[in-house]
Amino acid sequence: MPGGGPQGAPAAAGGGGVSHRAGSRDCLPPAACFRRRRLARRPGYMRSSTGPGIGFLSPAVGTLFRFPGGVSGEESHHSESRARQCGLDSRGLLVRSPVSKSAAAPTVTSVRGTSAHFGIQLRGGTRLPDRLSWPCGPGSAGWQQEFAAMDSSETLDASWEAACSDGARRVRAAGSLPSAELSSNSCSPGCGPEVPPTPPGSHSAFTSSFSFIRLSLGSAGERGEAEGCPPSREAESHCQSPQEMGAKAASLDGPHEDPRCLSRPFSLLATRVSADLAQAARNSSRPERDMHSLPDMDPGSSSSLDPSLAGCGGDGSSGSGDAHSWDTLLRKWEPVLRDCLLRNRRQMEVISLRLKLQKLQEDAVENDDYDKAETLQQRLEDLEQEKISLHFQLPSRQPALSSFLGHLAAQVQAALRRGATQQASGDDTHTPLRMEPRLLEPTAQDSLHVSITRRDWLLQEKQQLQKEIEALQARMFVLEAKDQQLRREIEEQEQQLQWQGCDLTPLVGQLSLGQLQEVSKALQDTLASAGQIPFHAEPPETIRSLQERIKSLNLSLKEITTKVCMSEKFCSTLRKKVNDIETQLPALLEAKMHAISGNHFWTAKDLTEEIRSLTSEREGLEGLLSKLLVLSSRNVKKLGSVKEDYNRLRREVEHQETAYETSVKENTMKYMETLKNKLCSCKCPLLGKVWEADLEACRLLIQSLQLQEARGSLSVEDERQMDDLEGAAPPIPPRLHSEDKRKTPLKVLEEWKTHLIPSLHCAGGEQKEESYILSAELGEKCEDIGKKLLYLEDQLHTAIHSHDEDLIQSLRRELQMVKETLQAMILQLQPAKEAGEREAAASCMTAGVHEAQA
């Protein structure tokens, strides 16, 4: 195998390469030798034709080098070892290379699922420029002529070193030549002397002498030696029209010819170059890699969307790719829309079920089935908690989807601005816009920086507000409101940051300028209309304040009602004691008279002291009873005023809720009309799906409002019917049932009195006195029972309207006590009535006998 040259220079092409170099060294002056030594340390593309040649590599070394997504270390090591066997140092080609790593990085494009073949694919009628190739034979005159035509400032008798130095300076100035083009300077064995010389007419393909893009796309010279690889897509996009780019992509995707002559081995690159290229490929931005790799991708090996960015971007190279991207977005957001609609339907079901349970509860209370009413109340409370957690919300106003739609609107606005620029430059507005993500990257980076700064500032502000809340309790409500506002802003900023990495440019780029304008206007109209519908979990502030006042009044009603009940109990106890004392006093007076008539003066003295103590006790109890009655009357008046305030606030809340529901209904109807008009001319599949979900949510909201209105109208109609009945029968008191209950013991007392009167006339004085005391006691008890029944009836109405279960249970116990008292009185009256009738009959019979005897 031929030996290698100094500093890792490759061996000569043939066996006479060494002698030729030796002869050249002897013939050249010392200055030329010095230049030769200096040139030997230069990169390959800057060396002259008299310098050490580059040996041919074996076919094993020329194997295609593949790396899917990165450089393979095993293949790099294999290529490096084979290169050293041929006398090549893989690191020698990169010594003092004027091309930086950043310049080499964009040339490497990795496509997932495909293998990148590094090599030159020769096209028909093209050749690589001889300026950057090593002459392998004596036919270098054409190359010198082309070099003279390319750079008129250089003379034909200039040395190769000066020419190459000038070329190196131009490479440094341009800064866009890929490193692979500068460092790969080997010739394949199969395309050496066998390749015929290219005719001179092929030189006319170059239109620009200094375009490195044009030079890198040329074909090999007489020996077919190629230096470089296709230029970066960024350089081509600035110098070629879209038609030329399409033709070039088609030629790249065409069938390959002889792989030995048309593919360049990449095994001469060292591990350091591989690492640099891999690092640069990792550091490059994802949109740039995607845009660069799209023209080089095989039709059958197109990469799919990244699962982490599903719905955020796609391949905009064809209509099928566009539909695939929209389908991905639809698959991502359809579950969100479905969940929102399910929550709306569930809330409507909860509202309907609550109305039915309330009706059943009212029926149970009317039928005195309080156990059923208690069970229904528990179910109603559970439904109320579920209603609070489930609130109506437009799918398009859902936080994540609303943020995404805002991001889409921003992308559409950016595309519109670019389309306006293209329209001003005379481009066709109906053709899809070819977007360049690199132009939008600075704006995205700036907005990202601003959002992060804004979020940090908001977080600091929130912490400061928390400290102020702890220090200043007096300003708690104001600071909490501000804290809520900042929290919402933080959530909005975080939602905006969520879409910073989501590039919709490929999708937006598929729409024409007219379609972009329609989508932008539709987004603005629908977002503005949806913002007018107050889809919140709780009503407005005015209604909430009134509801809080009603709650406080309800608590006051409970407290006052409890006080009135306690005072009534105390009054009843005091009356009972006073009645007992009044029952004992006549008996003590009679006993005192008998003691005095029987000359039992010590007994009469004791009875007098007993009568005096009972009298003083009765006076004290009567004073206390009068005070309790005054206090009870005050509480009753206060209870009446609180009930009036409660009813007034209830009416005001109902009025506010009616107005609020009316406004919501009107705004919802307007939004539904807007959605129906937009759906007819919608060009965006995602927006069409979102608007359909919004339309369904609006229909559910209208149905729930109609259910509530129907329930309210039924309640109003029932109240009107009750008022009509009361107005049609004025002699009948409003509380007829309670009056009947109140009159029942009085009727019993009157009947007892009517039956008792004859017996009183016939009986003696002692019987008359006992009957009088009994009748007075029973009359007072009946009067107390009547008052108690009236009070219980008022409390029962209050409990029914306020759904106060505690008060209902208390009233149940009170009614049970009244029933027991009435039953005891009836049992007490029956024996007295029978005894009085028997005594009256006996006395009458005795009187008749005496008269007959007389």
UniProtKB/Swiss-Prot annotation:
Region (Interaction with PAFAH1B1): 727-854
Chain intervals for the UniProt region annotation (Interaction with MAP1A): 1-292
The organism of origin for this protein: Homo sapiens (Human)
Annotated segments matching region Necessary and sufficient for interaction with PCNT and localization at the centrosome: 446-854
Protein name: Disrupted in schizophrenia 1 protein
Covalent cross-link Glycyl lysine isopeptide (Lys-Gly) (interchain with G-Cter in ubiquitin) as placed by the record, residue numbers: K372
Molecular function, one GO term: kinesin binding
UniProt entry keywords in alphabetical sequence: Chromosomal rearrangement, Coiled coil, Cytoplasm, Cytoskeleton, Developmental protein, Isopeptide bond, Microtubule, Mitochondrion, Neurogenesis, Schizophrenia, Synapse, Ubl conjugation, Wnt signaling pathway
Changes after translation: Ubiquitinated. Ubiquitination with 'Lys-48'-linked polyubiquitin chains leads to its proteasomal degradation.
Region of interest (Interaction with TRAF3IP1), residue spans: 293-696
Segments of this protein annotated with the region Interaction with ATF4 and ATF5: 598-854
Residue ranges, compositional bias (Basic and acidic residues): 285-295
Effect of L815P: Impairs interaction with NDEL1
Quaternary structure annotation from Swiss-Prot or TrEMBL: Interacts with NDEL1. Interacts with CCDC88A (via C-terminus); the interaction is direct. Interacts with GSK3B. Interacts with tubulin alpha, ACTN2, ANKHD1, ATF4, ATF5, CEP63, EIF3S3, MAP1A, NDEL1, PAFAH1B1, RANBP9, SPTBN4, SYNE1 and TRAF3IP1. Interaction with microtubules may be mediated in part by TRAF3IP1. Interacts (via C-terminal) with PCNT. Interacts with CHCHD6. Interacts with CCDC141. Interacts with FBXW7, the substrate-recognition component of a SCF (SKP1-CUL1-F-box protein) E3 ubiquitin-protein ligase complex; the interaction targets DISC1 for proteasomal degradation.
Function: Involved in the regulation of multiple aspects of embryonic and adult neurogenesis. Required for neural progenitor proliferation in the ventrical/subventrical zone during embryonic brain development and in the adult dentate gyrus of the hippocampus. Participates in the Wnt-mediated neural progenitor proliferation as a positive regulator by modulating GSK3B activity and CTNNB1 abundance.
Linked pathology: A chromosomal aberration involving DISC1 segregates with schizophrenia and related psychiatric disorders in a large Scottish family. Translocation t(1;11)(q42.1;q14.3). The truncated DISC1 protein produced by this translocation is unable to interact with ATF4, ATF5 and NDEL1. Schizophrenia 9: A complex, multifactorial psychotic disorder or group of disorders characterized by disturbances in the form and content of thought (e.g. delusions, hallucinations), in mood (e.g. inappropriate affect), in sense of self and relationship to the external world (e.g. loss of ego boundaries, withdrawal), and in behavior (e.g bizarre or apparently purposeless behavior). Although it affects emotions, it is distinguished from mood disorders in which such disturbances are primary.
Positions of region (Interaction with NDEL1): 802-835
Effect of L607F: Risk factor for schizoaffective disorder
Tissue: Ubiquitous. Highly expressed in the dentate gyrus of the hippocampus. Also expressed in the temporal and parahippocampal cortices and cells of the white matter.
GO BP of this protein: canonical Wnt signaling pathway; cell proliferation in forebrain; cilium assembly; detection of temperature stimulus involved in sensory perception of pain; microtubule cytoskeleton organization; mitochondrial calcium ion homeostasis; neuron cellular homeostasis; neuron migration
InterPro entries: DISC1
Biased composition (Gly residues): 1-18
Coiled coil: 366-394, 452-505, 602-666, 802-830
Cell compartments where the protein resides: Cytoplasm; Cytoplasm, Cytoskeleton; Mitochondrion; Cytoplasm, Cytoskeleton, Microtubule organizing center, Centrosome
This protein's encoding gene: DISC1
GO cellular component: cell body; central region of growth cone; centrosome; ciliary basal body; ciliary base; cytosol; dynein complex; GABA-ergic synapse
